[in-house]
């Protein structure tokens, strides 16, 4: 099991660079986390494993205000139609890639998507000011998702340890011929 952050986007296509930029800043903050960059969301399916914790950062286009941040637990629910359904600058949209992974049984148990509302995807253009200004908040959302997943996994590990201890006690009582 590993923690994995994936930045989706193309740094040469305006606001589409935001996912990659968020991932790069997370790498600087959390050297213990594996950070990958892809221009096509479908590439992520081969990068993760079912027991991984994965946070994906990507540009979204839902008609909201540039720089708005959307956080979705994609392991628990489908990505909202309209935000990640179209391919944008990608051959395949993130929503389609996630649903393909779900259908193939390749969805990680913890998958959070952090999207930054984008508007301009032109070749050779910089990120819009509002999108660039949202990067620190998106980085914080990714870090929070990682911390929340770590806390949940620690709780599950403790519950597993408690279950083992209870099983050991029951076995010891059985060996003594008593009732648990």
Where are these regions (language model features)?
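Glycine-rich phosphate/diphosphate-binding loops and the adjacent beta-loop-alpha structural elements
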Residues: 122
